[in-house]
A protein has these predicted regions:
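Short, high-confidence coil segments that cap the C-terminus of an alpha-helix
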Residues: 85, 117-119
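Conserved acetyl-CoA-binding loop-helix of GNAT-fold acetyltransferases
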Residues: 95-114
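Conserved beta-strand-loop-alpha-helix junction that forms the acyl-donor binding cleft
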Residues: 95, 122-134
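Conserved catalytic-core motifs of GNAT/GCN5-like acyltransferases
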Residues: 142-156
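A cross-taxonomic marker for long C-terminal extensions/tails that follow the last structured domain
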Residues: 152, 157-178
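Conserved acyl-donor/pantetheine-binding loop and adjacent beta-alpha core of acyl/acetyltransferases
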Residues: 59-89
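A short helix-loop-beta-strand connector motif used in the catalytic cores of GNAT acetyltransferases and
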Residues: 43-62, 68-70
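Short amphipathic alpha-helix that is part of the acyltransferase structural core
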Residues: 2-47, 173-177
Length: 178
């Protein structure tokens, strides 16, 4: 099974609140967002994205891959060496619909803050591109470190509050991640 299907889109919940779906290994991927078409990290296999403390989420218009680590990685190889629980590392995000990448990053950030209290930091492992810089800075992250192969941006709760002072009053309701 290569995971190409429209079933993921049909399982999505369209609400004004968060619209997030966890893509499990056995789940079909949205056809128009297939993992092999990842423009950020095309070299990463489906297996890599779903093993060793890693998850994939979608909102139907974007995909984000998250690794749970115990420190801030500087390379993709570090994602294997730093498996842990207290750092959520957004290591690839891409979108085929304008605005959906931003929505997914912010909604997943909020969701993890509310449901995974052990996560202390929300950091990216980003390519060293102007596009990545613009995306993360414009979405409220700060440049944490510049590395040889990557840049790390950090999303902090204080920045989320500036962007949306009432974020903590949101109810998950029908938006529970499946």
């Amino acid at each position: 099974m290569d995971g190409q299907s429209n079933e993921v889109e049909s399982q999505q919940q369209n609400t004004p609140e968060m619209d997030i779906k966890r893509v499990r290994y056995a789940d079909p991927w949205p056809e128009h967002l297939h993992w092999s078409g990842d423009p950020v990290r095309p070299e990463l296999s489906r297996e890599f994205r779903h093993t060793a403390g890693r998850e994939v989420f979608t909102n139907g218009g974007a995909i984000i891959c998250v690794a749970y680590c115990n420190d801030v990685p500087k390379t993709v190889d570090d994602l294997d060496r730093m498996v842990g629980l207290d750092h959520a590392i957004f290591y690839t995000v891409w979108s085929k619909k304008p605005g959906h990448g931003r929505m997914l990053v912010v909604d997943l950030w909020k969701y993890l803050l509310m449901t995974e209290p052990h996560i202390q930091r929300f950091v990216t492992l980003s390519p060293k591109t102007k596009m990545a810089w613009n995306f993360h800075i414009n979405n409220g992250a700060i440049l944490l470190s510049e590395n040889e192969e990557s840049d790390n941006y950090e999303y902090r709760e204080t920045e989320l509050v500036k962007d949306d002072p009432e974020w903590h009053n949101e109810k998950l309701g029908l938006t529970t991640v499946l």
